[in-house]
A protein has these predicted regions:
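Membrane-embedded catalytic scaffold of the fatty acid hydroxylase/desaturase
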Residues: 1-135
Length: 135
């Protein structure tokens, strides 16, 4: 689901404008994005980054948890977002592809917005031919 939402956020003009702020805010490849107490309240960078996170990940996660009555997933997602995500997703030294679409994988997406949309698993990019080899 997040794969398709991520692709939509690169196509629909208003969503693209909001999402591309995330691409500009990331310290590309250094893994130096420090934890901030605001992350505990799911606030990311600025209002556009926060709207991006809520529309693409948080609200869909809440809906999924409600539909399937799997509220543990919301707790896991909160922990992931508040404490782990920035240290893995934007860290070029964290690479466990093809198991997970980790730091190196995601940073390729930041350089080329037409590839590597997957957030956790690269299988969706491989299936829909939007994967790009790591450099």
């Amino acid at each position: 689901m997040i794969y398709w939402l991520h692709r939509i956020f690169h196509v629909v003009p208003i969503l693209k404008e909001i999402h591309l702020v995330h691409h500009r805010h990331v310290t590309l490849g250094t893994g130096s994005n420090k934890w901030n107490w605001k992350h505990m309240f799911l606030w990311v960078d600025d209002w556009k980054g926060t709207v991006d996170q809520w529309l693409m990940e948080i609200i869909p996660t809440i809906i999924f948890c409600w539909v399937f009555n799997q509220w543990w997933l919301l707790a896991f997602y909160w922990f992931w977002t508040a404490f782990v995500q920035e240290r893995i997703e934007h860290n070029k030294n964290f690479n466990i592809y093809p198991i997970l679409s980790s730091g190196k994988w995601h940073l390729v997406h930041h350089r080329n917005c037409n590839v590597n949309y997957g957030v956790f698993f690269p299988i969706w990019d491989i299936l829909f031919r939007t994967d790009s080899k790591l450099d």
